[in-house]
Amino acid sequence: MSTEHPSRAAGRGRPPSLRDVADRAQVSHQTVSRVINDFLAVRPMTRERVLAAIDELGYRRNNAARTLVTRRSGLIGVIAVGSFLFGPTSTLAAIQEAARKNGYMPLLATLRENSQAALIEAVDEVLDHGIEALVVIASRESMGRRTAELRPGVPVIVVGPNPAEADDLATLSVDQSAGATAAIEHLAGLGHRRVVLLAGPQDWVDAQQRLTAAQRCCDDHGIVSQVLLGDWSAASGFAAGRALLAQWAADHSGPLPTAVFAANDHMALGLLAAFHAAGVEVPADISVVGFDDIAGADYFIPPLTTIRQNFDALGHQVLLATLSALAGETVDLTPAPAQLCVRSSTAPPRA
């Protein structure tokens, strides 16, 4: 009869791994990770089966996982949807830089799709490395709601909206509403009373907040506004510009809009290209305001008036909130500021 230790038998001369436990319990390795890290979204019977397999195999968590208990791994998990858009990438870069400056190593996991399954998979991935805290960049409202449903056993900071069902969730963002309001206030101060609002996709929280604030400010100033939808791309801005020009050519019954507020700089770039191709002068014929202050916005033709997001301040606030959560303290979470940058794409409307 063999007297081989079960851990050696399972591992064939090596310590048993997480996958060995998964095979013995007939579950996925992600489920084993959730049990090890006290993730609540595991059925009791499944949890018992995994714990039994751990005991039978003599499985021991590796050093990285054990640091979760002592909170000394120096790792902060960061989850984001894979995107090359300016806002999400700038947010990610700011968080990574702030983490490094404070002696932490950011561990990034990108979502393959915007779904609960993909979010859980990403959470499992970073938990396996023994993170101390988790930062989720929730660009879409649905991702904020899904994050609220998770209780991974470590502090969670959401960069994005605060879901109504999770008032206890720490959330941070750039003040999108203040930025959009500043853009419309600028146009109102120049004397514009007919403004087109080129909004981003409405499943993005930033796009919703910018549009809502812009519409409210237009109403406050008695500005007549028209909403068009884009998809953040310069191509959608160009298409919107072409559509506006076609509308103006077909409808001579009323005054034309004198300004456009685009919800990001890429769409503003597309607008400028469409107007230039049609011989419409900016800002003599129409003013254009963007949002983001992307690299090169001051080299657009003409240089773009836009809203600058303070991502450095956002990254600092995320780290402050994370460190406070790790210390069991609360911190006053205020939106990072947004700043109006006035350049040459805006001017008073023609009389």
Regions found by a protein language model. Give the residues of each.
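Alpha-helical recognition/docking segments in bacterial nutrient-uptake
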Residues: 1-6, 13, 75-185, 189, ...
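N-terminal helix-turn-helix DNA-binding module of bacterial transcription factors
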Residues: 1-73, 350
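Flexible loop/turn connectors
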Residues: 11, 246-351
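Short beta-strand segments enriched in small/hydrophobic residues
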Residues: 24, 31-34, 68-84, 94, ...
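Short, solvent-exposed amphipathic alpha-helices that sit
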Residues: 49, 87-101, 179-183, 205-224, ...
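Periplasmic-binding protein-like
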Residues: 78, 130-138, 196-199, 227-228, ...
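Hydrophobic alpha-helical segments within soluble ligand-binding/sensing domains
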Residues: 170-197, 234-246, 268, 309-327
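An alpha-beta-alpha
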Residues: 181-221, 227, 332-347
